[in-house]
Every structure is written in C-alpha cells, then in structure tokens.
C-alpha cells in the first residue's frame, strides 16, 4: 500500500482504478476487511483461504516455509478472482506472490521486484532453511523468467535479474512526495541509521569502521528492531555486542522503532545519515534522509545509491568496505558545516526532481499499457510440464510426513527432545 500511495492521485487522474490485496505467508486476517484507503480498494488475505491452500500443497511438507509461500500466493490469486476484472496485474516478487499469475498467463502481468525471499536468503542465511532457500532460488529464476514484464527499483537489481533470467528488466525508481519537515533542530552531533538490526543492513560494517577510527569515531544511533543472526532464536544485537563489545552499545546505540514523524525529526537533526547495507534493492530511508537536508552516506550495495553523486549530493562507499566507510566518516567529521549544508540541499533537490511522482507515474502507466498491448498481440499459454507441476498443488498424500522415513529414528528423537526443551525453557 505504501508503494502506491504517492502514485494513486496521478493514476486516478488518468482514469485508472487500483485494487490491492495485502497478505503473505505470515499475514492474513479472519475477514478480507475491504476498505477504500486514499482512493485505493484494499483487501486483506483471508486466513481460511490461506489455510485451505496450505493443505493442498502437502507435497512440500518437508519445506513448510516454501509450502506457506506458495499457499499464500495462490490464495491471494484466488481472492482476486484470478485477475478476471482487471486490465493488468502487478505482483510482487517477495513471497512468490507473482508465481500464480506468471504461470497461469491469463492476464497482462508486471512483476515488481522489491526483493525476493530467495535473494534475502542469500544475504541473510538462517540455519535449517538451506534446502528451502535452494528451491526458492530455482523457482524464482524460472518463474520470473517466464513472466511477461519485469520491473524493479534500481539499476543493480535490474542487472541481477537480467543476468539470472536472460530477460530485459526495466528499472523505475519509486515516487516521492516531500512532506513538510519539522522545525529545524540543532544538530545532535551524532550519526543516524534507520532500519532493522539485520546482517544485510550492514551493522557489522559500521562497527568495523568505527573500530578503525578509534577515538575519532562519532556516536551513532541505530533506530530499528532486532532480528535473527544466522539461526532461529538468535539475536543480531546480541551477536554484535559479543563481536564488537567496545562499539555496539557504546558507540552505536540501538533504539526501538519510532513513528515516521520522529524518524524525520531525527534525520533532520543528525550530523549525518547512514545507509550501510551490504545489499538492498532500494532502501527508502535513504530518500527520506536525503530529503531531510542533512548529509547522507549510502553504500553502493543499496539501490538508492543510484541517486548519489559522491561529494555533490551525498557520499558513497563500496559495499562491505569498512575501511572506505571509515574514510568517509573522517571526511564528514573534518568538513565545514557550510559544505555539509550545501550537500544536504543538493540531496533535497535530487529527490524532488528524480522521484517526482507525476514523472514516475507516467513511466509506470506506460509500462502497464505496454504489458496490455503485448498481451493482446502475443497471447500466452499457461505453463505446463515440470515447472507448472512444481508450482501447483499435487495429488494429496495419505501421509505427508512420510519424508521422515529417510531419517534415522535416533536423530528424529534427539531433535524432538531438544526442540521440546527449548520450548519449555523459552
């Protein structure tokens, strides 16, 4: 919904109505709760529908996460009446939500690549999910390659999916409407990161850079919730505290999530804003930071780095390079206040012009019309064969846990005991 909010007024001015179904493998509601939100018809995935499709995918009992993603994708496609009332369908890559419309090929389709489950599993692997991740990589590559039109938000992600699929992938950045900023705040004298404490968001790169700076290292506030690090029940914050005890909790201070208004106030008061991600399809907080008027440092691993000209409207450093980040921090700490203000103002002008909603809306509408025209000229047929079979429900099994027969009983009992113990003492 957030992605479309800034575009809807321009869509409606062209007579385009937008309907959105919100949902995923982990998000559904008892009822669809239809509502009109800022001119968009919004529904929520129905839990009973998700559960019904989950039961039909029992061939993936050994891969419950994949099973739930496919179930959610088909449940949402069914709830949308398989796209029958729509001129064009836009489906997200995350959670395999694009798979049903891609393989059914019954409506014009644009796949919007915001960051797929398979991509995330590469940049943030979790113990025990390796088999699911490998399967997701294969399915995403094959099914995105079969989609009619493919879009994403940054040049780097377009290049990634083009290399994986051999298809043309267009890059259209998100739209941005500048909001009124709060009254000017005195500089906090501290750096600021907005985002989850997560491996691919780059907290370890920041810690390493600050460690290299020693006594010159600035204080940095990190605003965002904790996530797992490498294993379920783990903590990224705990990992960083153990790996960098002199930095995490001393030089980098974690804060819980705050409101968007508080984010804007913090960004406007920061000495600098930082996006240290080792990978990010785009990272919208970079745009918000640039709009604040304060200098913004962005890793080349984040797609939003497309907007930055180093030293002109912000600062860049190579993805994962702590030494380079330390050099940029040193550069900012020794730069004049006047120069930093000039760079911040240039960043504000960049996001106003490059992400102008009317301009972005025209590009997206042109892509929708191209998909509709292409579909009319070259109708597609549903995918069959192995790929089609893999992505659709299979014949029900009388014993969906039969895959456990391939494991030694001793291992099963040991794992069950350990899992029970963890639940008791949690």
Where in this protein do the model-derived segments appear?
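Short hydrophobic beta-strand element within catalytic cores of glycosyltransferases
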Residues: 295-298
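Membrane-proximal helix-turn-helix segments that form the acceptor-binding/catalytic region
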Residues: 117, 130-150
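Aromatic "clamp/platform" in nucleotide-sugar-dependent glycosyltransferases that forms part
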Residues: 278
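A short, well-ordered alpha-helix in the C-terminal region of glycosyltransferases
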Residues: 338-354, 363-366
């Amino acid at each position: 919904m957030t992605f479309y909010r800034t575009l809807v007024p321009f869509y409606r001015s062209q007579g385009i109505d937008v309907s959105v179904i919100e949902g995923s493998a982990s998000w559904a509601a008892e009822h669809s709760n239809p509502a009109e939100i800022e001119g968009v018809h919004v529904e929520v995935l129905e839990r009973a529908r998700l559960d019904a499709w989950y039961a039909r995918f029992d061939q993936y009992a050994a891969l419950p996460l994949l099973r739930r993603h496919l179930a959610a994708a088909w449940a949402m496609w069914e709830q949308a009446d398989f796209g029958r009332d729509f001129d064009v369908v836009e489906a997200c890559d995350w959670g395999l939500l694009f798979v049903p419309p891609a393989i059914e090929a019954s409506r014009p389709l644009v796949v919007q690549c915001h960051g797929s489950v398979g991509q995330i599993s590469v940049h943030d692997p979790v113990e025990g999910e390796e088999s699911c991740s490998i399967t997701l990589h294969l399915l995403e590559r094959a099914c995105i390659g079969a989609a009619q039109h493919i879009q994403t938000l940054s040049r780097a992600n377009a290049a990634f999916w083009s290399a994986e699929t051999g298809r043309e992938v267009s890059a259209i950045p998100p739209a941005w409407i500048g909001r009124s900023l709060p009254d000017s705040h005195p500089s906090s004298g501290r750096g600021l990161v907005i985002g989850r404490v997560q491996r691919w968001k780059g907290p370890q790169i920041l810690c390493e850079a600050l460690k290299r700076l020693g006594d010159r290292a600035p204080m940095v506030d990190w605003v965002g919730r904790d996530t797992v690090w490498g294993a379920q029940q783990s903590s990224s914050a705990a990992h960083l505290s153990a790996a960098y005890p002199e930095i995490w909790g001393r030089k980098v201070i974690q804060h819980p999530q705050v409101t968007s208004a508080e984010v804007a106030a913090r960004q406007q008061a920061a000495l600098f804003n930082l996006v240290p991600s080792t990978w990010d399809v785009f990272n919208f907080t970079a745009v918000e930071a640039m709009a604040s008027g304060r200098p913004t440092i962005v890793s080349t691993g984040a797609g939003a780095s497309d907007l930055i000209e180093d030293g002109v409207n912000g600062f860049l450093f190579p993805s994962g390079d702590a030494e380079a980040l330390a050099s940029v921090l040193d550069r900012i700490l020794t730069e004049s206040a006047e120069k930093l203000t000039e760079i911040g103002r240039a960043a504000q002008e960049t996001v106003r012009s490059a992400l102008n909603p009317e301009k972005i809306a025209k590009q997206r509408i042109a892509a929708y019309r191209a998909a509709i025209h292409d579909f009319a000229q070259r109708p597609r047929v549903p995918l069959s064969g192995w790929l089609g079979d893999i992505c659709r429900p299979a014949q029900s099994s009388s014993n969906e846990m039969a895959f456990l027969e391939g494991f030694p009983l001793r291992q099963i009992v040991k794992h069950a005991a350990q899992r029970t113990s963890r639940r008791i003492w949690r």
